[in-house]
UniProtKB/Swiss-Prot annotation:
GO terms, biological process: phenylalanyl-tRNA aminoacylation
Reactions that this protein is recorded to catalyse: tRNA(Phe) + L-phenylalanine + ATP = L-phenylalanyl-tRNA(Phe) + AMP + diphosphate + H(+)
A Pfam family per the record: tRNA-synt_2d
GO CC terms: cytoplasm
Compartments reported by the entry: Cytoplasm
EC number assigned by the record: 6.1.1.20
The protein, known as: Phenylalanine--tRNA ligase alpha subunit
PROSITE patterns to which the protein is assigned, alphabetical: AA_TRNA_LIGASE_II (PS50862)
Positions annotated to bind Mg(2+): E255
Self-association and partners: Tetramer of two alpha and two beta subunits.
Gene field: pheS
Molecular function as annotated in GO: ATP binding; magnesium ion binding; phenylalanine-tRNA ligase activity; tRNA binding
Protein species of origin: Sulfurihydrogenibium sp. (strain YO3AOP1)
Keyword Nucleotide-binding carried by entry: yes
Length: 344
């Protein structure tokens, strides 16, 4: 039998064997049998050199067409096998959706996190970016570079949690402002939310609480800009009709400094136990960045001005949701937490 007849017979055998492929093992065996280094089709192609030029061309074309036919048939079988495997996996892993699902109690967003998220979004809408920093901080960043001198009462052991080697648990998020001014050039507009720590525990104070502080630095930034930003913020939090007042105050890192009050949200300014019969509630502290702070971070106070502000998140949450004891926010009592389901 000549080579051409052998190839045609080989093609018929291939058709029958391909039809009987049912798994990858058989498929690979057929691939090796015909297309391997010692495979039947490979052997035919290697023997073409012994043929005349006319026969070589005709037989070569036939051998290559059979090779292509086998490769396509094997590829189709491979896809068929993989499809069946996937169907089998899906059949075994199929879920009976008619079965009743396990009931999970709907969660409730914690009022502190809800308030923090809302405050952050308000400032982001005004062009501020959010920055963060370590909670274990250098004493220089927490105090010295913020114009808080060595013997200032805030540095006392009874007020601050010190660790070692000039490190402490930050008492405010102001160190994030220092870090931002050290790594960025003006203009700067940031807010820094996070946990802070102070040695204090009573119905209105906690040794750990959340703060958000803001900083804006640029040329010609004024106290008027500060008042405008805070007015927009407070109206978004408490409503457009909330009375707002600024009172002169003192902070080492701002000059001039002010504290901001809003009309009591409980008695609507008439006077009650919450506002100590003043009709006002203290909300935050603020002021223009002290030139000494700018000098500490390498920003020229003759070229740039800026303002800073800071407020306690728990304070805002307590006022908004009329919570009388800050310790309730940290008890993990579901009876308390689930009251706030749906407020987010």
């Amino acid at each position: 039998m000549d080579i051409k007849a052998q190839l045609l017979q080989l093609k018929e055998e291939i058709k029958k064997e391909v039809q009987d492929i049912f798994d990858e093992k058989v498929l690979n065996e057929i691939k090796v049998k015909y297309l391997g280094k010692k495979g039947l089709i490979t052997s035919v192609l290697k023997s073409l050199g012994s043929l005349s030029p006319e026969e070589r061309k005709e037989v070569g074309q036939l051998a290559n067409s059979i090779k292509e036919f086998l490769e396509e048939a094997l590829k189709a079988k491979q896809e068929e096998i993989e499809k069946k495997k996937l169907e089998e996996i899906l059949r075994k892993e199929r879920l009976d959706i008619s079965l009743p699902a396990e009931w999970f109690e709907p969660s409730a967003s914690h009022p502190v996190l809800t308030t923090l998220k809302e405050i952050t979004e308000i400032f982001k809408s005004m062009g501020f970016t959010v920055e963060s920093g370590p909670e274990v901080e250098y004493e220089d960043y927490n105090f010295t570079m913020l114009n808080i001198p060595e013997h200032h009462p805030a540095r006392d052991m009874q007020d601050t949690f010190y660790t070692s080697n000039g490190m402490l648990l930050r008492t405010h998020t102001s160190p994030v402002q220092i870090r931002s001014m050290l790594k960025k050039k003006p203009p700067i507009a940031i807010v820094a939310p996070g946990r802070v720590y102070r040695k204090d525990m009573d119905p209105t104070h906690s040794p750990m609480f959340h703060q958000i502080e803001g900083l804006m630095v640029d040329k010609n930034v004024s106290f008027k800009d500060l008042k405008g930003i805070l007015k927009i913020f407070l109206e978004n939090i408490f409503g457009k009709d909330i009375p707002i007042r600024f009172r002169p105050s003192y902070f080492p890192f701002t000059e001039p400094s002010a504290e901001v009050d809003v009309g009591c949200t409980v008695c609507k300014g008439k006077g009650c136990r919450v506002c100590k019969n003043t009709g006002w509630l203290e909300i935050l502290g603020c002021g223009m960045v002290d030139p000494n702070v700018f000098k500490a971070v390498g920003i020229g106070p003759e070229d740039y001005t800026g303002f800073a502000f800071g407020l306690g998140i728990e304070r805002i949450a307590m006022l908004r949701y009329q919570i009388t004891d800050i310790r309730l926010l940290f008890t993990n009592d579901l009876r308390f937490n689930l009251q706030f389901r749906g407020i987010e």
